[in-house]
Amino acid sequence: MGARLSRSDFQWVYTDEPHTTRRREMLQKYPQIKQLMGHDWRIAAQVLLTVIIQLVMAIVVQDLSWKYVWFLTYVISGTLNHSLSISFHEIGHNLAFGNHRPTANRILGFIANLPLCIPSSVTFKKYHIDHHKFQGDDMLDPDLPTYFEAWLFQSRLGKLLYIIVQPILYAVRPLLRVPKPVTLLEVINLLIEIAFDAVIFYFLGMKSFVYLLFGTLLGLGLHPISGHFISEHYIFVEGYETYSYYGPLNYLTFNVGYHNEHHDFPNIPGYALPQLKKIAPDYYDNLPCHYSWMKVLYDFIRNPKLGPQSRIRRTIRSSALKNKNAIDLKNKSKVNEILHEVDNNNNTHPHVSREERKLLNIQKHASRLSTTINGNEHHSKHE
């Protein structure tokens, strides 16, 4: 923990994120993908069922001994509260009721947030959209670990602690990297949670409150489902920055494991992502993936080559915004225009390093030179 770390220890690339290019290609090849886009009522159904189960469990545990309270807190509440936190992901993309019903999506987010005891559904949406816009951007991706995290959590013990404190890091990291003003919806979210917490504590007591609150803290920490925090973008195979997980825990987590699929098409509900994979197997079957989130956590801790620094970092989008004096992101139309220009200039080799890119350029120029020489020889023969 805390060993010397330099800029070269991070995985730097000089191309844009790969999903924009993939999305464009896939829609041209498989136009039927558009039929999967939209919203899915099952998201709301799963959220409401999970919230009801948590409220019933909060009533049940109030009369149990503490050892059973803690056991159920980790096993049941940890699993269900983590599932609800992942529902913020679907709701944040307006996949529960569609883009035409934003208020319904926000209300569902408030309901999903209740058992977690910590206001987060609105804030998650506010920052998560930027993760898609600026994936891997050194300045603007709120999901990237800070340099301090990468320096602090390097050893096996450090990486174990890194996983345990994920709930804190995920809450604080965006505020440090790309802080944004507090919104009215966030204040409403806070007031609703304070009222809910007070009701639980007053009417059901300490055990019920502990069951819910620590279900969030433990469930988002060292818990099997927390493997998705690591599996999604940490570099397990050189040259790839997004990974999918195809395991049974997807049933509890709105298919969040289908992460390559989600980044390719954020407007497709999680329930439909397996269908996307079936439609375009040539775009997914050849990619490295995970089948166990527990193994992901184990490998992350044990492998000395893996750590918080094992993320792709780039500056292509923030540099473009800087050059056009739009890095503050205030002028949305200007930002979108610049990002559209970046998308149009997206590199056709999105996963290559600087050295590999140089090699590709050399090969390209060599090919052109060979073509020119052959053309000259052919022309000379005719003369």
Kindly label every feature range from the protein language model.
Residues I43, Y74, N81-H82, L185, ...:
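Alpha-helical hydrophobic/aromatic positions enriched in membrane-embedded helices and signal peptides
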Residues N81-G98, P102, T123-G136, Y234-I235, ...:
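Acidic (Asp/Glu-rich) catalytic motifs at the cytosolic membrane interface
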Residues R106-I111, Y240-F254:
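Membrane-cytosol interface motif
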Residues H223, Y258, G270-L273, K277:
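Short amphipathic alpha-helical surface patches that serve as generic macromolecular interface elements
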